[in-house]
């Protein structure tokens, strides 16, 4: 009601956006976000919510392109950094599914420049390495993940599997280094 009485109310728009997001009313979320950007085009809160709208449509690259200049303008704004990190994570997973791990890692590395302590980004980087069959790097980054109590054992088994793959790779490399090239010639 506050927004209908005063469409430019910053507090009313923030409340309307947050409550519509929590209630799953995405059309209203998008409408109020657009309204907020219209009235407050430089406000990071509305810009971060605009990125959320793009993410919801699985337009992660568009979200990142939208956020990059804003992030350069507000390099320490937590809302913008959080939105950029989230879009980066989604985009990296999208690129990984498309079999483009190098691009996925580049996206994650850029996000980690701004959000270096983000464990979710580090874990996702480990997932990308695992998809690219790089067990040592996968293990290093996935160990940052903090599993819930329910998934703890499963996650520990997964890390053990990565360690096992690392060991097999080391054994194979040691074997190859120990052999002389002439032995392969018949």
Give the location of each predicted region:
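TPR/TPR-like (Sel1-like) alpha-helical repeat modules
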Residues: 55, 64, 68-73, 130-153, ...
């Amino acid at each position: 009601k506050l927004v209908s009485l005063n469409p430019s109310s910053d507090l009313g728009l923030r409340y309307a956006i947050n409550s519509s997001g929590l209630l799953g009313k995405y059309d209203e979320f998008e409408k109020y976000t657009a309204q907020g950007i219209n009235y407050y085009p430089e406000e990071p809160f509305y810009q971060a919510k605009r990125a959320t709208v793009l993410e919801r449509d699985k337009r992660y690259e568009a979200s990142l392109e939208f956020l990059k200049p804003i992030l350069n303008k507000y390099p320490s704004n937590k809302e913008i950094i959080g939105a950029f990190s989230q879009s980066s994570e989604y985009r990296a997973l999208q690129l990984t599914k498309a079999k483009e791990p190098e691009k996925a890692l580049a996206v994650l590395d850029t996000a980690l420049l701004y959000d270096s302590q983000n464990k979710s980004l580090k874990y996702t980087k480990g997932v990308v390495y695992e998809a690219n069959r790089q067990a040592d790097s996968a293990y290093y980054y996935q160990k940052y993940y903090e599993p819930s109590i329910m998934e703890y054992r499963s996650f520990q088994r997964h890390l053990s599997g990565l360690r096992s793959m690392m060991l097999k790779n080391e054994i194979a490399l040691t074997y190859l280094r120990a052999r002389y090239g002439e032995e392969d010639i018949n």
